[in-house]
Amino acid sequence: MAIILVIDDQEPIRALLRTVLEGDSHRVLEASNGHHGLELYQERSPDLIITDIAMPEMNGLEMMVELTRRFLNVKVIAMSGGLESEGALKVAKLLGARQTFQKPFDMGHLLSAVRYDLAN
């Protein structure tokens, strides 16, 4: 059982991801912005982070910069929706995201990515 940190400012997205990931026997931590996500990562050292890009206070890209500055080998899957998502996801890849998903996405594909990233 892996610990997965889900970071998204939209509670319905977090709830959906929690349901899917817990159904696959993972423990899920939740944060609504990058600041809280960084705090949880430091306190709990999850095995994987799934983060949205566009969030208030500290967005996913800013959080990824901080994560890579402070910690080694952080596994991140980035997701984004909206008009700027394609460019933001390219930047996320450059910052070290292992996988990227444009919202809306297929939960089966995300779950496959989670399993792959946890195994490698």
Predicted regions: what they are:
Residues 79-80:
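Hydrophobic/aromatic residues positioned on beta-strands within the core alpha/beta folds
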Residues 105-115:
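C-terminal output helix
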Residues 62, 83-101, 112:
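Alpha4 helix (beta4-alpha4-beta5 surface) of REC/receiver domains from two-component response regulators
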Residues 32-36, 59-63:
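Acidic catalytic/metal-coordinating carboxylates
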Residues 8, 52:
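Active-site residues of response regulator receiver
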Residues 55:
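Receiver (REC) domain active-site loop signature in two-component systems and cognate sites
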Residues 11-29, 95:
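Two-component/phosphorelay signaling modules centered on CheY-like receiver
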Residues 44-50:
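Active-site beta3 strand of CheY-like receiver
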